[in-house]
Amino acid sequence: MLKLMRMAVVVSAAASISLAAGVSGNYIEARTADVFTGPCFANGEVEMNGKEAVFGWKITGGSWQGVSLEGLSVVGVIRSVHTLGNVYEPVNPVRAVLIVDSRADAEQRLALQSFARHMGGTLLGDIVQVDYAPIELTIQDGNIHGGAAKLTAGSLAAIQTRAMQATDHTCGNEEVWYPPLTELDHAMPAYALADSYQGDGLGETWSNGPRRSGFLGTFHVASE
C-alpha cells in the first residue's frame, strides 16, 4: 500500500512538472473572409478577400522557456498576398505585426514574442513591427462553445464574436472551409461581429464584419 502511495506521488509530481513546462490558454481569431461557409461563397471570395487576420492568445497558466506568462496575452496581425488558406497558392508571402501585452516585464515580453513565433510559424516569420499595448481577451463564462468573446489590444486591434446560429446558414451546406491559423487542442467557428486593425505597421488598416470569419479555441503546448 505504501509503495502504491509513493508511486502515486511520483506520477502526480511528474504530471505537475510536465504541465508547468508549457503554457495553456484561450485563442481567438478573425479574418476578412468567411471560414465557416460553403463552396458558393468560398469560391466567390478566394483571392478577393481573406488576406488579413487578427489573432490572439491568452495564457491562463504555465511558463515558456522558464518564464511565467500566466495572465498575459499576445496578438498577431497579418496581411498576405493571397487568401489565407488557399491551397492553390502554397507560397503566400505574409507580413506581420506583433502586439505584446504591455503589462509584461522585459523578460516576459521576450518570452511572449518567442511563444507567438512558435505558434504562428511561417505566418509570423516576417514581423515588420512589434507594438506594446494592454491586451484583454475575455470569453463569456469561459466557454468557447458559447461563442461570445472579445479581444482588445489597446486601440490597435479588436475582435468581438458571438455563437453561430441557424440563421447564419445561407447555402445549407456550410462547413469549416478554412482551419484555424494555429494549432489548437479544440476550436469552434464563431461569428465575428467586428474585427479591426488600426495600427501603422502594415501600411493599411481595416474594419471588418459582421461575417462568419472567427474561431475560438483552447491550447496547451510544451515549452521550447
Regions found by a protein language model. Give the residues of each.
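Bacterial N-terminal signal peptides
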Residues: 7-16
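Mature, soluble, non-transmembrane domains
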Residues: 99-221
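N-terminal Sec/ER secretory leader and immediately downstream segment
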Residues: 21-100
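Positively charged n-region of N-terminal signal peptides that target proteins for export
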Residues: 1-6
